[in-house]
Amino acid sequence: MKNIRNFSIIAHIDHGKSTLADRIIQLCGGLSDREMEAQVLDSMDIERERGITIKAQTAALEYKALDGQVYNLNLIDTPGHVDFSYEVSRSLAACEGALLVVDASQGVEAQSVANCYTAIDQGVEVVPVLNKIDLPAADPERVMQEIEDVIGVDASEAVRCSAKTGVGVQDVLETMIAKIPPPVGDPEKPLKALIIDSWFDNYVGVIMLVRVVDGVLKPKDKIRMMATKATYLCEQVGVFTPKSRPRASLSAGEVGFIIAGIKELTSAKVGDTVTLADRPASEALPGFKEVKPQVFAGLYPVESNQFEALREALEKLRLNDASLQFEPENSSALGFGFRCGFLGLLHMEIVQERLEREYDMDLITTAPTVVYELLLKSGEVVQIENPSRLPEPSRITEIREPIITINLLMPQDYVGPVMTLCNNKRGVQRNMQYMGRQVMLSYEMPLNEVVLDFFDRLKSVSRGYASMDYEFLEFRAADLVKLDIMVNGERVDALSLIVHRSNSVYRGRELVSKMRELIPRQMFDIAVQASIGANIIARETVKAMRKNVLAKCYGGDITRKKKLLEKQKEGKKRMKQVGNVEIPQEAFLAILRVEDK
């Protein structure tokens, strides 16, 4: 066991994490040159394209060190994005060490800070690595200082390498073997294995990626999940090198996979503990929690006959993504669709993109909303995620909105614009510290202000230099109201929003004027109104098209003209009583793009 090293790589997007992983795999001969391709561990197309890692992957490698011993290195690749922070914390819990990869030209960024703190909390040894030293803009001295100022890790002995050219990768491995402690665990104790990740395979069912903490696991053993209490028969165990290789057993300290004929992903929850059914461990490994969706949106097929196909596509996605939740809902304006829950904005985008790409779906997405907590007059507390389900105002004592803590990291020049943006979004500044040339701002901010367009606006005011990460803090009471849009006196449920009272009149006006441009003219006047409860706060009218009934009159008597105009008016009035208005798709999309200029 003293020759095993379990480690993961922490880095911000684009700092060269996957490339470094490729080089390490190549150096240890995990794959032949023929099978080697760029970003071996990112298996989904969308992961490659966006250059992000979504699912955790592993590679068990053998490395012959300079001291002549052969070490077993288990590389656990972690997602780098804040939406997947729970997956990151589980990946890190399975390691004893982590390589903190920092781009020698860009310096430290927010997400690597966040994941690094997670690592330090878990008691993981952090080894700083400066990547991309072959770039002309690289400034290793400054970046080392930044690592010490921002993260507080001693970086004087940071290894320098260039994953692209392969320079210094061997030094990274040597330093790692020297600094990262071997795993502790007892092969004699009852089995305890932590599920790092799980995914679905069409042939064998769910494949669980585990780190064995104590005990030994062999095929034909009966295993039990500690969170769900379900038991299964273990069919196969093995390791990934990144290709799967079956093994006779997995013992304490090792990282590998278990196949046990499990049908659904929800039975193998990330962070759960696997133990033997006939000799169970006394308690589970710490840190398991159910992941709760933070952001909700309605997904509707453009063609209503695609509803079943959408359900199937969502179910297939759920096989590989246990954190995706959905339930059918119907809207009088958009027909049948699903209300889906996501971990965050990136997660939502990825799910949408995969539906459109892998399953050829045409989707309409309603504006993303968050979960609100309501305290009712009856004293009960309920949570709603759909604005159109909000009960009557008379039954509600208070509405509480989710508040997040958001950490922003940016160069000094952009502090002003970023602070203005945060204040506009009702943020409260909690902290501000200068570290070298970077500034770190901490704000408490309502999540519903962030979900619409905060990220895009942040990038534009800081010219792309600011990076952010956020975590949920608490539900807090706020003065929120439900804004309804009415067309011709009828409420359109898909357009309801929950907004802050101070912002409501402004949002109402903006929406209504946008709607007026988008609803095609009919034969009668259409009133588009925004209301809060029974109060109309804004109104626009889509004017009717009318025929010139006086065209045949040349000159003639004024009373004759009056009669014709009155008759036309009567007709329009009758039409208005029976007419109904089709709202085009563009109108819904426009609502999503109401920019608070």
Curated annotation (Swiss-Prot):
Residues reported in the UniProt entry to bind GTP: 14-19, 131-134
GO biological process, one term: positive regulation of translation
PROSITE patterns according to UniProt: G_TR_1, G_TR_2
EC number: 3.6.5.n1
Topological category with respect to the lipid bilayer: Peripheral membrane protein
Matches recorded under InterPro entries: EF-4, EFG_III/V, EFG_V-like, EFTu-like_2, G_TR_CS, LepA_C_sf, LepA_CTD, LepA_IV
Primary localisation category: membrane
Catalytic reaction list: GTP + H2O = GDP + phosphate + H(+)
Molecular function terms, GO-annotated: GTP binding; GTPase activity; guanosine tetraphosphate binding; ribosome binding; translation elongation factor activity
Alphabetical list of SUPFAM superfamilies matching this protein: EF-G C-terminal domain-like, P-loop containing nucleoside triphosphate hydrolases, Translation proteins
UniProt KW keywords: Cell inner membrane, Cell membrane, GTP-binding, Hydrolase, Membrane, Nucleotide-binding, Protein biosynthesis
GO CC, one annotated term: plasma membrane
Localization, UniProt: Cell inner membrane
Domain tr-type G: 2-184
Family: Belongs to the TRAFAC class translation factor GTPase superfamily. Classic translation factor GTPase family. LepA subfamily.
General function of this protein: Required for accurate and efficient protein synthesis under certain stress conditions. May act as a fidelity factor of the translation reaction, by catalyzing a one-codon backward translocation of tRNAs on improperly translocated ribosomes. Back-translocation proceeds from a post-translocation (POST) complex to a pre-translocation (PRE) complex, thus giving elongation factor G a second chance to translocate the tRNAs correctly. Binds to ribosomes in a GTP-dependent manner.
Protein's name in the database: Elongation factor 4
Name of the encoding gene: lepA1
